[in-house]
């Protein structure tokens, strides 16, 4: 069994968008796709990015590329009807009081800032590019055909997800896998609506994994 087959998702000592159970399911999807070039929309604190880069390194050694797009600390610039994570709204309110003390008082570090995420991914700095800004602007200027896998987990409004998928699904290569998070999230029903419409309009293969991850690929 290879090292990548044995790879286990780690939450590290940060705030993770994916907890261990769903994180492992996600990295198993990455293993199945076996990508070299990876795009993530919605980096948050970089935990998923770090796991992806660790896995890409096992698969490709130093020959891989990760691109992450996020508003980072400028999340307040999102469109007015956007769904913002409670963790950001409450100014890094950790459930773990020790984490709160260390990050908010001792280090004074905003985990979703570009600087913090860059430091967290420094191990792979030659393979990683982080772009700060609105995905609606950045995607249209990005060559999406280079990516083998795209993880969509940024804005959760219908408008944002639909716009992102309109660009992505029309510009990816044939064997690219697009995975959208939070397909069944009740607090953001616009995600499911946008995905369902995009699948119908583009006639893509579609399946939902673990009642959470919507997987799209060309027929």
Question: How should each PLM-predicted stretch be described?
Answer:
Residues 1-219:
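A short alpha-helical cap/connector motif
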């Amino acid at each position: 069994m290879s090292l990548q087959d044995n790879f286990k998702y780690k939450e590290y000592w940060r705030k993770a968008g994916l907890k261990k159970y769903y994180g492992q399911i996600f990295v198993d999807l990455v293993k199945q796709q076996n990508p070299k070039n990876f795009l993530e929309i919605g980096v948050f604190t970089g935990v998923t990015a770090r796991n992806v880069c660790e896995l890409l390194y096992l698969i490709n050694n130093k020959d891989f590329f990760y691109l992450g797009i996020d508003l980072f600390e400028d999340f307040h610039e999102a469109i007015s009807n956007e769904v913002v994570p409670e963790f950001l709204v409450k100014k890094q309110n950790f459930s773990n009081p020790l984490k709160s003390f260390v990050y908010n008082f001792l280090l004074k570090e905003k985990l979703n800032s570009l600087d913090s995420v860059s430091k967290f991914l420094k191990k792979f700095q030659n393979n990683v590019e982080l772009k700060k800004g609105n995905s609606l602007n950045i995607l249209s200027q990005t060559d999406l055909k280079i990516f083998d896998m795209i993880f969509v987990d940024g804005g959760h409004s219908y408008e944002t997800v639909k716009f992102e998928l309109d660009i992505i699904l029309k510009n990816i290569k044939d064997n690219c896998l697009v995975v959208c998070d939070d397909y069944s999230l009740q607090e953001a029903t616009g995600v499911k609506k946008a995905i369902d419409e995009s699948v119908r309009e583009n006639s893509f293969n579609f399946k939902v994994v673990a009642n959470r991850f919507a997987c799209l690929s060309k027929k």
